[in-house]
C-alpha cells in the first residue's frame, strides 16, 4: 500500500529553524512537516501535538508521523538521553553526597539534601520517576562535571543517529540551542527499552527515597502507568516554552508500540493513549512510512580528531573513588593546571615588580 504525505502548516513557535536534509534519517517521507500516514487503514487520531511519531519497537517501523524531524525544546524528555548515557558509566551502588548546586536546581526536584547520601541508583529513580532536576545535576557532577556530561550525551545522540538532538542541560531545562525531535525521542526511548536498568527505572510506579532522616515515597509522573493497559512507561516533560512533550511505550500481545509527541498545548494523556491504540490496531497491516534506524557502530560514532571526545569510561569498583564521595569536591587535572598557572604567574609578576620597581596596587592581577 502506498504512503500518502499530507502537508500541513505547522507553527514553529518554540522550535529551532533547520535545513531539511536531502535524505532525512529514517526515510524520505519523514522529511514532511505534515502528517505522513499509510493508505488502506484509518488515519491516526487527531492530536494537538505539533509533532509526533508512532512506531513499532520490535521492528523499528514508523507507522505514522507528523513533522517527525521538527526540532523543538524537549523539556524533561531529554532526561531519557541523560539516563541512557550515564547508566553504563556509573556504578549504581556508588554513594554520593550532592553539592549545594545540585540541590538548588530550579524547577521540578525530588528534594536532594547536602546532609544526605544517596546511591546512584536512587538518583536514577529520581531522574526518571520524579523528573528531578536536582538528581540530573547530581548525576552529571558524579560523571565528572556538567561539561563532560554534555559531551557524553551529545556523543550518545550521534551514536544513535539522533541528529536533531543537541543537549545543553542534563535536566532538559530550556536553554538556547537545545533541541530534539519526535523522531529522535523515539530513537532514544527504543534504545533505552533495550537496557534492563533503564527499563526498570521508567516502569517503577512508586519507590522509597532516602532523606537525611529516614525516607519518603516518590511516584512516577507518567500517568499512563496507572491508566493504560500494558504501559511500560518512559518520560513526560513540560516547560512554558517547550509546552508538553512525551515519549512512551506499551506492550500488548507480545508487541510493543511507542509514541512520542512534542509541543502539546494541553492535557495530552488521553490523546497519547488514542495514538497507542491506533498503533496496535494497524501494526502488521499498514505499510510503514519510515524506519527507526539502528545506532552507528562505535568507530563511526566516535568524534573526529580535534573534536571534544568523551573521556569518561565505565566506572568499575576497581577504579572508582571511595564508596562515599562528594560530587562537588572534585580535584581534576584542569583545576590543578589552573592552580599551577596562578602560582607561576604570581612568581613572574613578583620578579618583574622587583626588577623594575614599579609600584602596583595589590589585587589587580587576574586569572
Please report, for each region that a protein language model flagged, where it lies by residue.
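Domain-terminus/edge residues, biased toward the C-terminal soluble/receptor-binding domains
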Residues: 163, 170, 174-184, 189-367
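Active-site-adjacent loops and short helices of periplasmic peptidoglycan-processing enzymes
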Residues: 2-183, 187-196
Amino acid at each position: 500500500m502506498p504512503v500518502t504525505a499530507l502537508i500541513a502548516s505547522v507553527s514553529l513557535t518554540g522550535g529551532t529553524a533547520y535545513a531539511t536534509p536531502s535524505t532525512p534519517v529514517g526515510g524520505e517521507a519523514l522529511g514532511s512537516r505534515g502528517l505522513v500516514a499509510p493508505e488502506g487503514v484509518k488515519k491516526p487520531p487527531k492530536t494537538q501535538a505539533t509533532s509526533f511519531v508512532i512506531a513499532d519497537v520490535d521492528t523499528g517501523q514508523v507507522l505514522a508521523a507528523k513533522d517527525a524531524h521538527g526540532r523543538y525544546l524537549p523539556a524533561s524528555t531529554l532526561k531519557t538521553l541523560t539516563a541512557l548515557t550515564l547508566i553504563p558509566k556509573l556504578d549504581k551502588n556508588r554513594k554520593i553526597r550532592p553539592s549545594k548546586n545540585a540541590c538548588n536546581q530550579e524547577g521540578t526536584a525530588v528534594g536532594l539534601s547536602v546532609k544526605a547520601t544517596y546511591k546512584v541508583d536512587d538518583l536514577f529513580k529520581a531522574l526518571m520517576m520524579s523528573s528531578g532536576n536536582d538528581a540530573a545535576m547530581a548525576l552529571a557532577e558524579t560523571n565528572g562535571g556538567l561539561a563532560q556530561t554534555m559531551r557524553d550525551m551529545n556523543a550518545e545522540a550521534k551514536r544513535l543517529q539522533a541528529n536533531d538532538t543537541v543537549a545543553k542541560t542534563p535536566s532538559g531545562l530550556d536553554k538556547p540551542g537545545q533541541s530534539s525531535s519526535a523522531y529522535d525521542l523515539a530513537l532514544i526511548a527504543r534504545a533505552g527499552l533495550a537496557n534492563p536498568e533503564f527499563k526498570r527505572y521508567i516502569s517503577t510506579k512508586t519507590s522509597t527515597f532516602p532523606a537525611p532522616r529516614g525516607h519518603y515515597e516518590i511516584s512516577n509522573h507518567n500517568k499512563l502507568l496507572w491508566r493504560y493497559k500494558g504501559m511500560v512507561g518512559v518520560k513526560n516533560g513540560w516547560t512554558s516554552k517547550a509546552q508538553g512533550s512525551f515519549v512512551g511505550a506499551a506492550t500488548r500481545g507480545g508487541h510493543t508500540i511507542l509514541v512520542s509527541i512534542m509541543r502539546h498545548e494541553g492535557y495530552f494523556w488521553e490523546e497519547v493513549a488514542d495514538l497507542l491504540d491506533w498503533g496496535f490496531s494497524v501494526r502488521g497491516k499498514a505499510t510503514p512510512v519510515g524506519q527507526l534506524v539502528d545506532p552507528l557502530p562505535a568507530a563511526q560514532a566516535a568524534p573526529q580528531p580535534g573534536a571534544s571526545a568523551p573521556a569518561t569510561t565505565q566506572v568499575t569498583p576497581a577504579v572508582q573513588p571511595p564508596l562515599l564521595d562528594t560530587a562537588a569536591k572534585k580535584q581534576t587535572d584542569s583545576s590543578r593546571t589552573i592552580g599551577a598557572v596562578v602560582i607561576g604567574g604570581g612568581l613572574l609578576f613578583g620578579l618583574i615588580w622587583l626588577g623594575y620597581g614599579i609600584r602596583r596596587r595589590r589585587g589587580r592581577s587576574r586569572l
